[in-house]
Amino acid sequence: MELGIVAKRETPRAVELADRIRRHVDVPVTLDNLTADELDANGTDVTSLSACDLVVSIGGDGTFLFAAREVSPTPVLGVNLGEVGFLNAVSPEECVETVAGVVERMQAGDAELQELPQLQATGPGLSLPAAVNEVAVLGPQRGRDNGLDIDVRVNGEGYSSGRADGVLVSTPTGSTAYNLSEGGPIVHPDVSAFVVTEMCAESSMPSLAVPTDRTITVHVDGADHAVVAADGRTRSQVAPPAEITLAVAADPVRIAGPKLEFFTALDKLD
């Protein structure tokens, strides 16, 4: 078995914990390049850590999302450095023992893994990674007299059409992120649904929860271009008229370690 570690960049506490973990576990450990440089060790790019059996992310949800995108479907264990931490269930004080315990259980073949759905966007000229949090389909810019014409369908049945700044489709994981700021609902992680939320629509429909086995299509027109963004990091332009298809991705995010105390994390949103 091999363990990979990704630590939040420019964060001495994260690097310190990475060093403690690698010295404690009794399996080969590979560090991401930036962490390895801090510890004067050999490292590799984060994508190559997908060859490991388990990857430990040390930081906040952003670090976890970055690691999960790069190494999926390799399981990820998140160590939370005091942020909201909807994805990171392990505290710094418990991380060394927790990682060692998960490694032992994985070696014995009895580790429990939680799987979270990802969202895949496809369409003309699109080349986007699967999204852990959300996919946004946006006009050239937001605001009055901007946006684009949209037609949203679920398995071919019409949900909404009209002028809007865009459409946001969120996973349960992403429901506490961009989706929440756009007025969408929080979705419990045990609920297998995507959330469709229009963004500043002229005739807005309420947000819609859609089973993850359904296909969502967004037809866009009425603008010189549209932008499709996965998790706010990777963007691609499409030329209207065009249709973007959103469906559950082939590979889920797999989380190792203790299960998240969801309602405890919600308290930190205040």
UniProtKB/Swiss-Prot annotation:
SUPFAM superfamilies: NAD kinase/diacylglycerol kinase-like. It is found in: Cytoplasm. The keyword NADP applies. GO terms for cellular component: cytoplasm. InterPro entries: ATP-NAD_kinase_N, ATP-NAD_kinase_PpnK-typ_C, NAD/diacylglycerol_kinase_sf, NADK. Its EC number is 2.7.1.23. Pfam families: NAD_kinase, NAD_kinase_C. Its cofactor is a divalent metal cation. Gene3D superfamilies: Probable inorganic polyphosphate/atp-NAD kinase, domain 1, Probable inorganic polyphosphate/atp-NAD kinase, domain 2. GO terms for molecular function: ATP binding; metal ion binding; NAD+ kinase activity. It is an enzyme of class 2 (transferase). The active site is at D61 (proton acceptor). It catalyses: NAD(+) + ATP = ADP + NADP(+) + H(+). Keywords: ATP-binding, Cytoplasm, Kinase, NAD, NADP, Nucleotide-binding, Transferase. Its main location: cytoplasm. The keyword Isomerase does not apply. GO terms for biological process: NAD metabolic process; NADP biosynthetic process. NAD(+) binds at D61, G62, N133, E134, R144, R163, D165, T176, A177, Y178, N179, L180, S181. Involved in the regulation of the intracellular balance of NAD and NADP, and is a key enzyme in the biosynthesis of NADP. Catalyzes specifically the phosphorylation on 2'-hydroxyl of the adenosine moiety of NAD to yield NADP. Belongs to the NAD kinase family. This is NAD kinase. The lineage of its organism: Archaea, Methanobacteriati, Methanobacteriota, Stenosarchaea group, Halobacteria. The gene is nadK.
